[in-house]
């Protein structure tokens, strides 16, 4: 039986003789035209360590596709480095790159009638971009995560890239020596691989195991390790089998499997960006999913992993402790996982977990049983109030001050806020408001890791609030509220905040409130004028014109 269900449209018949001529130039033989064409969407790049180790994974996938009697077709996908672009205009391209990656993969797979696709990616937006494409295409596909970086070390202290961001604030506050500042800088990132805590890349890749679109154990492997290469090869082999069975992403990505994915995100203390990305993935898969669904999952799934940024350990520690399968098995046994959901292997998630022990190993303190959960409820909360009528996203577990009321310190751009923080003009009790940074206003919802890390480095992480219509890095922790909707650019209440206004952030009541009376707000609203777009041409202008609100995933199509 031939499995070239799609590629036959480009390789078969008299009219396709010119096509075959071009394939012969690529080294194809006559019998290859009856084999499935499998795309390898290769995100390798020397822009960032997150993607610098992907070529060997792509090569392994290519070899495995050939060994499975299919034709690999390699094409590139772009990336930017969130970590390097952080705090610059380049960060505005981060979320935009999610859409560009999805569009690139869709374009190549559809334009070439590929029968399946292996997506290989590393940096933060590679994961949602690839999964959005797979959900849109509904062509057999699998995600191969590039793997995590190993932790750095300086004077016996484990480091991640966030250590370097926080060192900026510590150094400028006089709390760190020049030697230690440079030591952290040089040693925070010792290998290839994505940022090591349960930040955005590891959050999304971990959730893909639960979603059923990546192989178990694959998300917590370190990029330099041979097992990561072996996993890439096995992923490609599994994908060819999925092509033969015609097992498609929408057979796997359902409301129930998204609930599984979000449950793992809650259990592991994952990134706020996952809220935005799963709204977009669900939209691409035509699954009914809203921000209220995150709140529903949060209330029933506890945090059972002690992982950075708010915890102690990194992804390699999680891997040694049993990885995501151990987390999944604990959730399954507790009735917090849909065990009947299909995975890319053709087996259910329950079948995949049958050999995983029900109790985590006693010689580790990364993963905890349900009855010893770190927090009884999840950490990613949806806050609402007159400052975020359509919702905002916050991490609320582990806060020493879960309720804060203070004066607004208002900034219409990130650099002004950084100058105020590093210039010691922010005080305990202040609430920073960074606005005009939403999907349309930024545009692109840039992440605010630089200012939040600087605040932490200054020793104000537990005493200063932070509100934005932009995003936060997966490495952010503290009293931070992002994704405020409606955003300032479209006239959301955040645009009406004035310097010194009283604001309340209440993690108990899930409240984000501007303490200004309705009459005054009405007066301000009548006087407000929408600013001119920051960009009038290029990809940022396109994104600003097309992007939906943050509470709808900031999708463009």
UniProtKB/Swiss-Prot annotation:
Its EC number is 4.2.1.9. Mg(2+) binds at residues 82, 124-125, 447. The active site is at residue 473. It is an enzyme of class 4 (lyase). It holds the Pfam family ILV_EDD_C. Gene3D superfamilies: IlvD/EDD C-terminal domain-like. Binds 1 [2Fe-2S] cluster per subunit. This cluster acts as a Lewis acid cofactor. Pathway: Amino-acid biosynthesis; L-isoleucine biosynthesis; L-isoleucine from 2-oxobutanoate: step 3/4; Amino-acid biosynthesis; L-valine biosynthesis; L-valine from pyruvate: step 3/4. PROSITE patterns: ILVD_EDD_1, ILVD_EDD_2. InterPro entries: DHAD_IlvD/Edd, Dihydro-acid_dehy_C, DihydroxyA_deHydtase, DiOHA_6PGluconate_deHydtase_CS, ILV_EDD_C, ILV_EDD_N, IlvD/EDD_N. It comes from the Bacteria. GO terms for biological process: isoleucine biosynthetic process; L-valine biosynthetic process. PANTHER family: DIHYDROXY-ACID DEHYDRATASE DAD, DIHYDROXY-ACID DEHYDRATASE, MITOCHONDRIAL. Belongs to the IlvD/Edd family. Homodimer. HAMAP family: IlvD. This is Dihydroxy-acid dehydratase 2.
């Amino acid at each position: 039986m031939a499995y070239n269900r799609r590629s036959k449209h480009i390789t078969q018949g008299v009219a396709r003789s010119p096509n075959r001529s071009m394939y012969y130039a690529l080294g194809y033989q006559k019998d290859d035209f009856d084999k499935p064409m499998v795309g390898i969407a290769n995100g390798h790049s020397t822009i960032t360590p997150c993607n610098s180790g992907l070529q060997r994974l792509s090569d392994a996938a290519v070899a495995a596709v050939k060994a499975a009697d299919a034709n690999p077709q390699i094409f590139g996908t772009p990336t930017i480095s969130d970590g390097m672009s952080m705090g610059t205009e380049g960060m505005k391209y981060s979320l935009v790159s999610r859409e560009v990656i999805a569009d690139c993969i869709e374009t190549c797979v559809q334009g070439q009638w590929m029968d399946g696709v292996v997506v290989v990616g590393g940096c933060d937006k590679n994961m949602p971009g690839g999964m959005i494409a797979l959900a849109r295409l509904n062509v057999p596909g699998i995600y191969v995560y590039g793997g995590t970086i190993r932790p750095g070390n300086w004077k016996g202290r484990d480091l991640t890239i966030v250590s370097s961001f926080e060192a900026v604030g510590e150094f400028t506050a006089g709390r760190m020596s020049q030697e230690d500042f440079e030591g952290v800088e040089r040693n925070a990132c010792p290998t290839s691989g994505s940022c090591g805590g349960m930040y955005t890349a590891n959050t999304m890749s971990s959730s893909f195991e639960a979603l059923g679109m990546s192989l178990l154990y694959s998300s917590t492997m370190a990029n330099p390790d041979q097992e990561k290469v072996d996993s890439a090869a096995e992923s490609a082999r599994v994908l060819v089998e999925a092509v033969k069975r015609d097992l498609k992403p929408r057979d796997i990505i359902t409301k129930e499997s998204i609930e599984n994915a979000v449950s793992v995100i809650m259990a592991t203390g994952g990134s706020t960006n996952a809220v935005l990305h799963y709204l977009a993935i669900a939209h691409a898969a035509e699954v009914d999913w809203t921000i209220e669904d995150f709140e529903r999952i949060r209330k029933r799934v506890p945090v059972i992993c002690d992982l950075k940024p708010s915890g102690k350990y990194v992804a390699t520690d999680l891997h040694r402790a049993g990885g995501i399968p151990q987390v999944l098995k604990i959730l399954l046994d507790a009735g917090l996982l849909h065990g009947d959901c299909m995975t890319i292997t053709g087996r259910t998630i329950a079948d995949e977990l049958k050999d995983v022990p029900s109790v985590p190993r006693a010689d580790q303190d990364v993963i905890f049983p349900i009855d010893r959960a770190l927090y009884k409820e999840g950490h990613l909360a949806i806050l609402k109030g007159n400052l975020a009528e359509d919702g905002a996203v916050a991490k609320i577990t582990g806060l020493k001050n879960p309720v804060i009321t203070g004066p607004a310190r208002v900034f219409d751009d990130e650099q002004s806020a950084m100058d105020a923080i590093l210039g010691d003009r922010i005080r305990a009790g202040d609430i920073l408001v960074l606005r005009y940074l939403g999907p349309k206003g930024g545009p692109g919802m840039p992440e605010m890791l630089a200012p939040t890390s600087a605040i932490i480095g200054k020793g104000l992480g537990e005493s200063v609030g932070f509100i934005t219509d932009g995003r936060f890095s997966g490495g952010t922790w503290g009293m931070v509220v992002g994704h405020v909707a409606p955003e300032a650019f479209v006239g959301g209440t955040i645009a009406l905040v004035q310097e010194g206004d009283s604001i309340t952030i209440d993690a108990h009541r899930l409240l984000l409130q501007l303490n200004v009376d309705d009459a005054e707000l009405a007066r301000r609203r009548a006087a407000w004028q929408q600013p001119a777009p920051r960009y009038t041409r290029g990809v940022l202008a396109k994104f600003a014109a097309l992007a939906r609100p943050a509470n709808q995933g900031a999708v463009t199509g």
